[in-house]
Amino acid sequence: MRTDFTDDTTWAQTLAAVIASYREDTITGLTPVNDAAFDRLTLDALGELIHDQTYVFLADATTMTDPEHPLLAVDTSDESSHGNYPMLRLAPSVMAEVEVNLFLANTDFADFADTVDDDGVYRGLNR
């Protein structure tokens, strides 16, 4: 979900990198959302919008300004954590690895969070 609309070129590059991380036959639950109604969406407001979603990936201001364009992964599985969700950053190139494993429940959010690099970005297990 795009929440920063300051740079259309960076958005297009980031989305292309995300899509490229998937193989053609990959089973996924990912739906890119590019709607200016979500510009500057806060995590509190996010909680009001998502129902029955266990995770959300955001292209926020950091995504648009950091040269690596790390997306913000938000674990929304615990409704009681409204606004205080567990989060991690991930490189667009590992989106399929993270999203598909969460979608299929092969791995949980904490497993990925436990393996982020020192800068808080998950870049994959096989680097």
Specify the residue positions occupied by each region the protein language model found.
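Short helix/strand-capping turn motifs
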Residues: M1-A110, L125-N126
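Short linear, low-complexity motifs centered on an aromatic residue
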Residues: T115-R127
